């Protein structure tokens, strides 16, 4: 069975690993290749702070909440693993801040120790009148992609830097299954009017005294369009830009100033922080994730395509649940082709 995964961000690599983990023992040979024109450190995943938090509003597809929870539980089970540091995985506590009371999020029982802020805590943030405190996880994209790449390489997965122009091109080369994890660029391979870039820009600073995440929310300006501060292992990520439909990959000085002024107002000690890096990336925004099978007719035969893209700004938050779901779709393909029994249901 020849499988080609297109895309080498967190969605592509985790899906490749999940398929191999689930089926390599029951399907011989299982040949997996990863095609991408960008690998770490040049992917969208590399720009992300890696903070686990779904959107505040419930997803239109209820399965997405399950996939996010599966990802949190999977990561939490690795938090004391000797590999946690290599994954860029650690616990972090902090604040979500609002100007008025809002309902608790559906994921409040997934994270650890969720509670409302006390009046004394709110005194620390005079611009805000309501908030939550909880402990969540950070999975730093750059570390995690490197770790996934090493695990896949150990398993014999091959990587090829190439720009794929069409599914037909890959199918004609002999792929039995194509896994489409091309993120914001999925529309190049197949038109998708629902998919848009959600441009983000972030500043990374050296500020080791910042120990808590701080996310602010402005309902009128939409998700990710107000200041946020997220500490990592080496640097602190500052953000607050979300521009739907903007394909400009260059850093913008106006956006830089918006981020810097907003974050320094939130945490004045940042004014003394040294800027280490500044990056721009595109969140693959879609009303709901596209995670489904499609049959592609190429010449006399059919090639199976599994689509797994459109994860917006929460790819690291939901990636493992989506990888498991994609692996189940792969298993159904094998069943239909009478190539394998389904793996045990402990997934």
From Swiss-Prot:
D-dopa binds at residues 53, 283, 313. It holds the Pfam family DAO. It is found in: Peroxisome matrix; Cytoplasm, Cytosol; Presynaptic active zone; Secreted. GO terms for cellular component: cell projection; cytosol; extracellular region; peroxisomal matrix; peroxisome; presynaptic active zone. Interacts with BSN (via coiled region); the interaction is direct and inhibits DAO enzyme activity. Keywords: Cell projection, Cytoplasm, FAD, Flavoprotein, Oxidoreductase, Peroxisome, Phosphoprotein, S-nitrosylation, Secreted, Synapse. It catalyses: a D-alpha-amino acid + O2 + H2O = a 2-oxocarboxylate + H2O2 + NH4(+); D-alanine + O2 + H2O = pyruvate + H2O2 + NH4(+); D-cysteine + O2 + H2O = 2-oxo-3-sulfanylpropanoate + H2O2 + NH4(+); D-dopa + O2 + H2O = 3-(3,4-dihydroxyphenyl)pyruvate + H2O2 + NH4(+). Catalyzes the oxidative deamination of D-amino acids with broad substrate specificity. Required to catabolize D-amino acids synthesized endogenously, of gastrointestinal bacterial origin or obtained from the diet, and to use these as nutrients. Regulates the level of D-amino acid neurotransmitters in the brain, such as D-serine, a co-agonist of N-methyl D-aspartate (NMDA) receptors, and may modulate synaptic transmission. Catalyzes the first step of the racemization of D-DOPA to L-DOPA, for possible use in an alternative dopamine biosynthesis pathway. Its EC number is 1.4.3.3. This is D-amino-acid oxidase. Residues 216-228 are annotated as: Active site lid that may open upon substrate/product migration in and out of the active site and close to increase the hydrophobicity of the active site, to make the hydride transfer reaction more efficient. Its cofactor is FAD. One of its GO terms (biological process) is digestion. It comes from Macaca fascicularis. It comes from the Eukaryota. The keyword Disulfide bond does not apply.
């Amino acid at each position: 069975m020849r499988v080609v995964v297109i895309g080498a961000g967190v969605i592509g690599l985790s899906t490749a690993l999940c398929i191999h983990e689930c089926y390599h023992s029951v399907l011989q040979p299982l040949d997996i290749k990863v095609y991408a024109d960008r690998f770490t450190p040049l992917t969208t995943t590399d720009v992300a702070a890696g903070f686990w938090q779904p959107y505040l509003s419930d997803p239109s597809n209820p399965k997405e909440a399950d996939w996010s929870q599966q990802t949190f539980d999977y990561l939490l089970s690795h938090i004391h693993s000797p590999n946690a540091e290599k994954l860029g995985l650690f616990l972090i506590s902090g604040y979500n801040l609002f100007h008025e009371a809002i309902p608790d999020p559906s994921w409040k029982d997934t994270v650890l120790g969720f509670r409302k802020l006390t009046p004394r805590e709110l005194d620390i943030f005079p611009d805000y009148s309501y908030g939550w405190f909880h402990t969540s996880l950070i999975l730093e994209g750059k570390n995690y992609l490197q770790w996934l790449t090493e695990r896949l390489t150990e398993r014999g997965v091959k990587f090829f830097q190439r720009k794929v122009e069409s599914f037909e091109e890959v199918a004609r080369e002999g792929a039995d299954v194509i896994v489409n994890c091309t993120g914001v660029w999925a529309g190049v391979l197949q038109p998708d009017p629902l998919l848009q870039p959600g441009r983000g820009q972030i500043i990374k600073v050296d500020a080791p005294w910042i120990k808590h995440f701080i996310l602010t929310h402005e309902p009128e300006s939409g998700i990710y369009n107000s200041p946020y501060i997220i500490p990592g292992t080496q640097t602190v990520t500052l953000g607050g830009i979300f521009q739907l439909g903007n394909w400009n990959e260059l850093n913008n000085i106006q956006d830089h100033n918006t981020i810097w002024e907003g974050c320094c107002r939130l945490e004045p000690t940042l004014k003394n922080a040294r800027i280490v890096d500044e990056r721009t990336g595109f969140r693959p925004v879609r009303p709901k994730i596209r995670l489904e099978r499609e049959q592609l007719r190429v010449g006399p035969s059919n090639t199976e395509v599994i689509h797994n893209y459109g994860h917006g700004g929460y790819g690291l938050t939901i990636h493992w649940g989506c990888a498991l779901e994609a692996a189940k779709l792969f298993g159904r393909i094998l069943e239909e082709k009478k190539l394998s029994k389904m793996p045990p249901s402990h997934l």
